[in-house]
Structures are given as structure tokens and as C-alpha cells.
């Protein structure tokens, strides 16, 4: 027994120290496991501590290899095929206690006669982690934060019905989508023509008062659509707004992309980068110039924001953090998608009632050369083609969001339930109902 002691003391853990503390498993063959990569720390395999008397028949890697070589069995937990016990031996689970030192194969054999709901739940959690590529349902730093339990939609209503509040009204709110959570994020300086947007968003995010920012609502925010028209006429309609949203949502780092975004911010400890982008996008949507009183959003602005929201949907599905069930990201997606669906449904209502919101601002500015001319940038369409083109475009945009909402529902089902998960399920179902209602209205 004394001769075996040095060999046992030199034996390293099958899982790294970080995973062992959380009672998780990882692969020792890899230079760094997924959990350590998320936390941005190297894997450390210390010597396994063994206290108490060793078991009567300890199983080693060689014994396991011989057994698998003869019988060709598969381990019921790790599902490792026969002859590949070297990979299975890397998942040794060391439990500290009186004479408790066994492998996952021993644990599964012992648990066959006394299976409990807790053990089956643990197996299901490990299975879900292997299926979707994350180590634990509680791995997401958003779910571990205190704001996860106190989540609330912090978008206070405006003074009158149908008018969303200015970002300045959000300064006193709290929650994951509020400016207080985003106070540590720097907003870059935008070009001169985006001065109203930069000042408004910066005041909404940082809540600055004093010498840094002087409140001048008349100069910061355009007072009417005529001033917004001048900004549009300067080439801001699509390319300029694209630069503005990229500067606001990506901190001035260029085009939004899943690979570049996660490479620059692979796993942020403060907040998921996708959730941060969507929170800022919500503030951009609630800007007074986009939601005027007794008026509807411009059609070109609606189409552009729908494209931005669709790209964020795609980035979230490829984000490493959001793949581990970030409920905050799903909630923000529901909010932004609901805004776009409402705006598209307004267009469908106008078309059904014989009205439209396309020519109100561009009529007479650029008359078409003939009845088949369609000016996409200025949206000056022929009277006979305007309704049919708009109807086809709105149908396409609405149907494109249907599979996205189905994917969001599947991601939400991966959770263990709770108030936020139920709220997301309700929002997704409401958005789906609005899409079907708008499509039915277009068919009529």
C-alpha cells in the first residue's frame, strides 16, 4: 500500500481545477477547455487529493482499456465507443470524501440501482451542454448576474399615447437594458451631421449632468420632420444611417459581424456584446425623430431598422455567449422585432385602407420619368406600381421574420422556466400573432 502512494499522489485530475470546483468535467487532452476559454484563463490540472482508505478494487485506465478492448462496450454516460478508453479516462471525476474515488463509469454503475431525479437532471444538463456546445446551463454570466432576477423592461411610456419616451427619460431607470448598466461603455464621436444622435444617445447612456453636457433640446433634437428631411437629403438615408448605427452599437469598430465581434470581445464579463448592441438599438428606435407624435415611422427607416434587427438575429445565433441561452438577448430581440412588426403592420393597414405613407414627404421632389420608374432611394413610385411593389416588399419582410421567431422559441425552451422565460414566450407568441395578422391583412 505504501508503494502505491507516490503514484497516486502524482496522478492529476481528469478535469481542470476550475471545472472540478464547479463539479463539471472537461477534456484534459485539449490545451484549454470551453469553460476556461469563456472565463479567459488557462487550464490548471493539479494533483488529485485523496483522503481516507482507497477502494478495494480501484479501476485504472489500463484496466478500463483492457475491458473495452475485450467487450467493446460503450460507457452509458460519456457514450464513448469501445477501444477509445483513453478519451474516457480523461473524464475522471474525483470526489473528495471518505474513500470516494471513482470514475464516471463507476458512478453510472452505482447509480443504476438508486437513480434519483437529481441525478437524471444532472445527466440531462450535461447532455444539453454537449448538444449545444456549452458546459452548463448556468455558464452564462448574464444568468449569474443579479440583474437577471430583477429584469424589467425599462421603457417608460411617453406623455401621450403612441409616443415613445426620449432616451433622456431613461436616465433614472434600472435594469439590464437601462443606461445605468451601460454606463461603462464609451460612445464614440459621430460625424457632424449625427450631432443630434450622438448627444441624445450619450446623455441617455451616461446620464451626464454638469459641465460635460448642456441640455439644449431645441439644438440637439430636430424639432420637426423638415429638419430631418435636410439630413435625409444629404445622403443619410441608408449609408449614413448604417454608419450611425454601427458607431453607436459597435463602439465605432466598423460593420457588425459575428466573427469580428466575438473575436474582439470573445466573452465579456460585464455583459453580452449582442445584448449591449440591442439595448443601444432600442434607444435609437425610441429617438424622438423616429417616433413623432401623431405620426408613423418613415417607410425607408422601417425597412432599414428591420434589416439591422435581422442581422442582429443572425449574429446572436452565432454568438458563443448567446448560444448558452442568454435570456436577456432573447428579450431584447423580442422588443426590437416587435417594433419593426408594428411599423410594417401600419404599412399593411394603410395599403388595405387605400392610403400609404410613402409619398407624403417625397411627392414632387423627383418625378419618375415614366410609369415604370421606381426611385428606391427616394421612394417615388408610380401610382399604379406603388401599392403592388410595397405590398410585395412588406410580405417578403414579414415572412422573413417567421423562421427567426421559431428559432427564438426553441432557444427559450432550453431554459428551466421562470418569470423571464415565460415573458419571452408570451412576447414571441404575440409577435407571431402580429405577423400572421399583417399577412392576412395583406391577402385581403
Curated annotation (Swiss-Prot):
Locations listed in the record: Nucleus
CDD domains, sorted: GAL4
Biased composition (Polar residues): 76-89
Basic residues: bias regions: 50-59
This protein's record includes keyword Zinc: yes
InterPro entries attached to this UniProt entry: OAF3, Zn2-C6_fun-type_DNA-bd_sf, Zn2Cys6_DnaBD
GO molecular function terms listed in the Swiss-Prot or TrEMBL record: DNA binding; DNA-binding transcription factor activity, RNA polymerase II-specific; zinc ion binding
Keywords tagged on the record: DNA-binding, Metal-binding, Nucleus, Transcription, Transcription regulation, Zinc
A GO CC term assigned to this protein in UniProt: nucleus
Principal localisation: nucleus
Start-end of DNA-binding region: 16-43
Region (Disordered) residue spans: 49-89
Function noted in UniProt: Transcription factor that regulates the expression of the gene clusters that mediate the biosynthesis of the host-selective toxins (HSTs) AK-toxins responsible for Japanese pear black spot disease by the Japanese pear pathotype. AK-toxins are esters of 9,10-epoxy 8-hydroxy 9-methyldecatrienoic acid (EDA). On cellular level, AK-toxins affect plasma membrane of susceptible cells and cause a sudden increase in loss of K(+) after a few minutes of toxin treatment.
Extra remark: Gene clusters encoding host-selective toxins (HSTs) are localized on conditionally dispensable chromosomes (CDCs), also called supernumerary chromosomes, where they are present in multiple copies. The CDCs are not essential for saprophytic growth but controls host-selective pathogenicity.
Name by which UniProt lists this protein: Transcription activator AKTR-3
Annotated organism of origin: Alternaria alternata (Alternaria rot fungus)
Gene from which this protein is expressed: AKTR-3
Amino acid at each position: 500500500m505504501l508503494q502505491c502512494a507516490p503514484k497516486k499522489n502524482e496522478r492529476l485530475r481528469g478535469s481542470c481545477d476550475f471545472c472540478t470546483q464547479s463539479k463539471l468535467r472537461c477534456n484534459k487532452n485539449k490545451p484549454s477547455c470551453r469553460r476556461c476559454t469563456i472565463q479567459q484563463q488557462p487550464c490548471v490540472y493539479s494533483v488529485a487529493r485523496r483522503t481516507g482508505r482507497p477502494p478495494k478494487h480501484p479501476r485504472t485506465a489500463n484496466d478500463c482499456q483492457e475491458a473495452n478492448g475485450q467487450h467493446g462496450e460503450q460507457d452509458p454516460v460519456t457514450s464513448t465507443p469501445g477501444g477509445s478508453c483513453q478519451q474516457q479516462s480523461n473524464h475522471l471525476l474525483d470526489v473528495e470524501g471518505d474513500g470516494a474515488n471513482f470514475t464516471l463509469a463507476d458512478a453510472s454503475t452505482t447509480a443504476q440501482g438508486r437513480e434519483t431525479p437529481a441525478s437524471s437532471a444532472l445527466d440531462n444538463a450535461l447532455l444539453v451542454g454537449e448538444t449545444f456546445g456549452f458546459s452548463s446551463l448556468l455558464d452564462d454570466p448574464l444568468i449569474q448576474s443579479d440583474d437577471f432576477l430583477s429584469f424589467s423592461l425599462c421603457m417608460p411610456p411617453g406623455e401621450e399615447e403612441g409616443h415613445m419616451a426620449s432616451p433622456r427619460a431613461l436616465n433614472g431607470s434600472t435594469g439590464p437594458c437601462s443606461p445605468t448598466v451601460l454606463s461603462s461603455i464609451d460612445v464614440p464621436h459621430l460625424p457632424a451631421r449625427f450631432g443630434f444622435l450622438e448627444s441624445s444617445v450619450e446623455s441617455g447612456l451616461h446620464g451626464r449632468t454638469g459641465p460635460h453636457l448642456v441640455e439644449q433640446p431645441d439644438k440637439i433634437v430636430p424639432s420637426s420632420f423638415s429638419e430631418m428631411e435636410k439630413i435625409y437629403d444629404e445622403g443619410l438615408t441608408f449609408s449614413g444611417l448604417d454608419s450611425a448605427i454601427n458607431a453607436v452599437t459597435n463602439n465605432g469598430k466598423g460593420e457588425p459581424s459575428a466573427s469580428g465581434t466575438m473575436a474582439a470581445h470573445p466573452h465579456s464579463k460585464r455583459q453580452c456584446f449582442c445584448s449591449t448592441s440591442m439595448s443601444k438599438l432600442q434607444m435609437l428606435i425610441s429617438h424622438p425623430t423616429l417616433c413623432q407624435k401623431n405620426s408613423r415611422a418613415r417607410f425607408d427607416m422601417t425597412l432599414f431598422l428591420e434589416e439591422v434587427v435581422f442581422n442582429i438575429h443572425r449574429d446572436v445565433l452565432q454568438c458563443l455567449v448567446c448560444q448558452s441561452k442568454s435570456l436577456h438577448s432573447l428579450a431584447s430581440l423580442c422588443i426590437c422585432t416587435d417594433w419593426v412588426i408594428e411599423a410594417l403592420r401600419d404599412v399593411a393597414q394603410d395599403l388595405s385602407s387605400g392610403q400609404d405613407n410613402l409619398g407624403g414627404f417625397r411627392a414632387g421632389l423627383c418625378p419618375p420619368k415614366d410609369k415604370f420608374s421606381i426611385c428606391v432611394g427616394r421612394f417615388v413610385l408610380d401610382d399604379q406600381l406603388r401599392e403592388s411593389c410595397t405590398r410585395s416588399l412588406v410580405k417578403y419582410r414579414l415572412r422573413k421574420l417567421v423562421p427567426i421567431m421559431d428559432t427564438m422559441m426553441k432557444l427559450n425552451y432550453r431554459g428551466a422556466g421562470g418569470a423571464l422565460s415565460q415573458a419571452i414566450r408570451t412576447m414571441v407568441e404575440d409577435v407571431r400573432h402580429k405577423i400572421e395578422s399583417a399577412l392576412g391583412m395583406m391577402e385581403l
